[in-house]
Amino acid sequence: MRDVNLELGGLLLDMAALAGNSQRAWGYKRAAKAVFRLDRHVTPLIEANTFKAVPGIGPTTDRIARELIYERKSALVEEAIRAAGKEEAIATLRRFRQHFISRATMEEVLARRGAPSRAKYRGDFQMHSIWSDGSETLDSVVEACLARGYQCAGMTDHSYGLPIASGMSMAQVVEQHAAIDELNAKYRGRFRMFKGIETNIRTDGTVDMEPHELRLFEFVVASPHSVLRKTIDQTSRMVGAVSQPGVCILGHPQGRRFNVRPGVAADWDQVFEAAAKREVAIEIDGSWDRQDVHYQLAARALDHGCIFALDSDAHSNPELNFVDIAIAHAKLAGIPQARIVNYWSEKTFLQWAQGAWDR
């Protein structure tokens, strides 16, 4: 699947990397952001000679776009790379951009008929509030979820083992759960917030909380937040995580970041096989710079019989929109709606999540 907007934005980031910390680098990054945010594909804009009217787009970006569309590569960019002697560095950055999708492609995919759909999506099961590294109160999150038509959601602030993300102490967990109980009473019949936690997967495959602590939550997400730039095999780490009692969602499994790092290196078929046996959901994290797992890996997970969670990983209310990216990846992967926990009833979700202690 070719995504010209993603390719073009990537070329602009290549030029920014070559320009260092200069004003030119800032300009290329601004143009790349404009391209990634476009809700239309660049090609018809170039053909209509209207691309330069997009805010942030200048003559050089227009030229690079024309070269990419008509020649399938940009001579201007390639010459700049050769002149700087940065072929290896740029090739590395390009690997960090594989299997992402732009907003334009997301909108195109979501417009296709068939499931999974935005309309029947019931609730998001990875999000963060002011209780850890998010910026919204619980009340604000509930109102934002209701505005999106959700019936439920799962709050998954960080665990205490990740202090860099202001992970919650167990005393704070007790306080937060009391606040969630109050909200659920207030919104009874309209909305339910589930008590979740995003735990950190240690290098040995265990998570950073004790079993008796994990049992306080209605569902547990386990995610990697360290050793995400190395090429060492971490299959045992990830298999260990999905094999741990109580864990029911493997969050942003690769831990990759767009144009920054590749994330965990693992035999993902082994990981997916282990997850399928325990009915641990593989997350498609829709955060723009994560998109993790991507549609190709998701399709492989589906072949192994996995179930899935499509989440935003929102740290502010506008970021709840990231779930649309996750849904688009799921559609590209051909995942049936019945295999996605975000479309299940509250009763079915809770039975499955609590069953993670016994499977």
Where are these regions (language model features)?
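Long, highly charged, low-complexity intrinsically disordered interaction regions
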Residues: 1-114
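Charged catalytic cores and adjacent phosphate/nucleic-acid-binding surfaces used
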Residues: 40, 80-121, 138-149, 160-191, ...
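Flexible glycine-/small-residue-rich
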Residues: 69, 127-129, 284
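Ser/Thr-glycine-rich phosphate-binding loops at phosphate-binding pockets of nucleotides
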Residues: 125-130, 152-156
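Active-site beta-strand->loop->alpha-helix modules in alpha/beta enzyme cores, enriched
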Residues: 197-200
